[in-house]
C-alpha cells in the first residue's frame, strides 16, 4: 500500500528510498578526503553520521555546543554511531581555521574543532592572534602555525572536499548531515539530527 501511495504521488517507494540511501552512504564513505578522514567512534557502528561544516558557520557552532555533546555521549561513545567530520569552508577564514586544525597533532583534531566552534564569536574578530593561541594550546607552535597556513597542497585538498560534496552529494550549505546516506537538514533544526539517528537505529532494530 505504501509503495502504491508513493507511486501515485510520484515519489520513490520505501524500498527504492532505502536503496538510494544505501547507495549514497557507500558513495559518501568512498569519498575519503585526499588529506585523510577524521572520524570518532567504532568503524563497525550500525550508523554512520557524516557532517559537512564550516568553521565560521553560526549554525554549526550552535550544533557543536548544544547538540553534539549529547550525540557523542549517547551514540558515539556507546558504539552506535561512527561520526565523520568533513571540512566545508564557506570562506577564506574558515579555510585557514581548518588548515590549522589539520596541522595540530591528530589526537587533538576534534578537541581543536570543538574549541573553534565554542570560541567562534571571539576568534573571528581577531583571527590570526586568537587562532594561533588556540592551536598553540593544542601543541602547535607559532612557527609551525605560520608554515601551516602557507601549505598550498593542504588548502587545495580541503577545498576539494567542498567541491566534491557540492557536485556529487548536493551539499549547498552548512551544517549538512548524512545519516546512513539519508540527508538531514541541520541548518533549520539541529535537533533533527538526533531524531534521524533514532529513526535509523529503530529501522535497524538497534535502538
Labelled PLM ranges:
Residues 2-89, 202-207:
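Extracytoplasmic thiol/disulfide redox context detector
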Residues 40-47, 95, 107, 126-129, ...:
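Residues at secondary-structure transition points
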Residues 36, 96, 145:
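Glycine-rich, flexible loop/turn motifs
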Residues 53-56, 61-136:
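Structural alpha/beta surface segment adjacent to cysteine/selenocysteine redox centers
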Residues 18-21, 54, 134-207:
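C-terminal cap of thioredoxin/glutaredoxin-like
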Residues 34-35, 118, 179:
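Residue-level signal for pocket-adjacent positions within structured domains
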Residues 3-4, 116, 149, 197:
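A general structural motif at alpha-helix termini
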